Amino acid sequence: MNIYQKVAKNIKYYRKLKGLTQDDVAESTGYSPEYIRRIESPNVKKKGFTIEAVYIISLALNVDIAYLFDEPKQG
């Protein structure tokens, strides 16, 4: 699993933990729902998102950005 896949899994995990939809996160961040779906995709590629995007999403999820780079949680 590469770093992009780790971040993707963690964003999805914390989003669901907070009871948010991809549309909710998109609205909170100003990103399109399609962009959020692409970031959460298990097939996310290099340059699929920026550190700035991860930071903005971490604010929307109210999660420390470091947690999004940890080993993915189960769930």
Model regions and ranges:
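Short C-terminal boundary/hinge segments that cap the last helix of small helical domains
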Residues: 62-75
